[in-house]
Every structure is written in structure tokens, then in C-alpha cells.
Design a protein with these regions (language model features):
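Amphipathic alpha-helical repeat scaffolds of TPR domains
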Residues: 257-270, 287
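Acidic, Mg2+-coordinating catalytic module of metal-dependent nucleases/exonucleases
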Residues: 180, 185-256
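Conserved RNase H-like, two-metal-ion catalytic cores of nucleic-acid enzymes
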Residues: 61-132
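Conserved DEDDh/DEDDy metal-dependent 3′-5′ exonuclease domain
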Residues: 103-192
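Repeat-based scaffolding regions
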Residues: 280, 284-287
Length: 287
């Protein structure tokens, strides 16, 4: 057992070493490069590795509907508020398109409310031709908001509505809902993927960030929200990939009884109702 003097000496040695080396440096973040678009808005581009997407589980994730994985597009928005209505706009629409060379990320930033129609046109052009639109909890707010803004801008939402849509939240609740654990995107990233976010700016700060940008005219005021949006895009894509792995091969990929039973429930929902009903009747009838 160390004496008191030895403990003090060791503590002084550790303190001296820390003073020499300094505290761990914060991770260096690359600057966000805002490009001006022909429409007068801003575009931020980035690339990331693409996860493997297994088509075998897609039918279960889509409730039996048909779609392809040839041109997957992940969509996420940042808005000026959560109330909806005609006063709320999506000032940042992020798209992550999966291709053979990885994930191409395009984040469309509205330079001013007066240029919203042009930005929405750029988004529609980028989404057109996709075989699957992937989102997280967007069905109930973001997509209706985009449709409303398109109507107000006198533009058609047909290109957006024509793409089959997978909202990962519904699948995530089946596979990963647990008592006492929420199904927010950041929570699932940490709990399911083992990837807790570091130094992330919460989406709730989006309205204030856009207001600050409009006052200053400096798009760098939105850099933190652009990074947050990019994390949302990549997190949604990673969760979709994980879900498709589990649904494609439940017995090989499921890591818990909850995942296995959730996969069974999702696959069961793809069966025609008449077949499920007749099977239940046969099971209940006396032999």
C-alpha cells in the first residue's frame, strides 16, 4: 500500500505530464463550403461511404409494397418552426443519394424566403428518378410541409409523390422499441448502431440559426445546422441498412429477441389479409 507521500508524489507526476501534453484536442471539423447555385441559393456537397442495402428485407419494411434499391435517396429537412402552416418553411433540405461510388450528399439551403420556390425546384430535380425515398419521422411533418410549400410556390409535387417512400421510424419502432427507451434518431444511433453523436447541434436550434443568418447574410451562421442535417441523413441511412439486414436474414442478423419478434411482425404484415384471416380460422377450428 502506497504511503501518503508516495500518493502525493504520483499525483504531482501525473499533473506534470498532463500539463506538458495538454488536454486532448477537439476534433477538427472541415469547413462547410457553401456554393452559390444558378437559382441564387446555396448548395453544400459532401461524400461518405455507402452501407450495404439488402433488397431481401425491403418488402417487409414497406409493408408489402414494391420498390427498388437502384437509386436510393435519403431526405431530411430543417425548418423555421414545428407549428407548420403557411409561415413555416424548410430552409434546408438535405439529400443523400446512394450510388456505386458511395453516398453523394447535397444540402440545399434557401438563401432567402424570396428564393424558396427556386430552391424547391432544385430539390425536385434532384429527387426525380429515385427508386426509393428514405426518411425518418418525416411522413407526418416534413413531407406535408414540402407539399404545402410547393403548392404556395405554384409547383407540382408529383415528382416527390411518385417515389416509393420508406419512413424508417415505423420499422425502427417494430425492431427496437423497448420499455423506457425512446426511438429518437440520435438515441437509436447510440443504442442500435453504437455510434453516439459528438458535439451535435440539436435540430431545435434551427429556427434561431436561420434567423441569425437572415440578419447577417453570412451562410456560415448555418454551418452547425448543415452538419446536424448531414448527421441525420447518414444516421437514417445507417438505420435503414441495419433494418434491411435484420429483415433479410432475421435468424442470422437479429441480435435480440426483440429484433427477431419485430422482424416476424413486419413480415407477417406483408401477407394478404384474407390469407392471415383464413390461417387464423383454420388454427382456431377444432380438428
Amino acid at each position: 500500500m502506497l504511503s501518503r507521500l508516495e500518493v502525493v508524489t504520483e499525483l504531482r507526476r501525473v499533473i506534470a505530464r498532463l500539463e506538458r501534453t495538454g488536454s486532448p484536442a477537439a476534433p477538427v471539423r472541415p469547413p462547410v463550403d457553401f456554393e452559390r447555385t444558378p437559382s441564387g441559393n446555396y448548395l453544400v456537397r459532401a461524400r461518405a461511404p455507402a452501407p450495404t442495402l439488402r433488397p431481401g428485407g425491403l418488402a417487409a419494411a414497406l409493408g408489402g409494397r414494391v420498390a427498388g434499391l437502384e437509386r436510393v435517396c435519403v431526405l431530411d429537412t430543417e425548418t423555421t418552426g414545428l407549428a407548420g402552416g403557411t409561415g413555416t418553411i424548410a430552409f434546408l433540405v438535405g439529400l443523400a443519394r446512394v450510388g456505386p461510388d458511395g453516398v453523394a450528399i447535397e444540402q440545399h439551403v434557401c438563401a432567402s424566403p424570396a428564393r424558396e420556390a427556386e430552391m424547391l425546384g432544385d430539390v425536385l430535380a434532384a429527387v426525380a428518378g429515385s427508386t426509393l425515398l428514405v426518411t425518418f419521422n418525416v411522413r407526418s411533418f416534413d413531407l406535408p410541409l414540402l407539399r404545402t410549400r410547393l403548392v404556395l410556390a405554384r409547383r407540382s409535387a408529383a415528382a416527390l409523390d411518385a417515389v416509393p417512400h420508406l419512413d424508417v421510424l415505423g420499422t425502427a419502432r417494430r425492431l427496437w422499441a423497448r420499455p423506457g427507451a425512446d426511438c429518437r434518431l440520435v438515441s437509436l444511433e447510440a443504442r442500435v448502431l453504437g455510434r453516439p453523436r459528438q458535439d451535435d447541434t440539436p435540430g431545435s436550434e434551427a429556427p434561431a440559426a436561420y434567423a441569425a443568418y437572415l440578419r447577417s447574410g453570412d451562410p456560415r451562421q448555418l454551418a452547425a445546422m448543415v452538419r446536424h442535417n448531414r448527421e441525420d441523413l447518414l444516421g437514417t441511412l445507417a438505420l435503414a441498412a441495419r433494418a434491411l439486414h435484420v429483415l433479410d436474414s432475421p435468424f442470422a442478423e437479429a441480435e435480440s429477441i426483440g429484433e427477431l419478434s419485430g422482424a416476424a411482425a413486419l413480415w407477417s404484415a406483408t401477407r394478404p389479409r384474407s390469407r392471415r384471416g383464413s390461417s387464423a380460422s383454420r388454427a382456431a377450428s377444432p380438428r
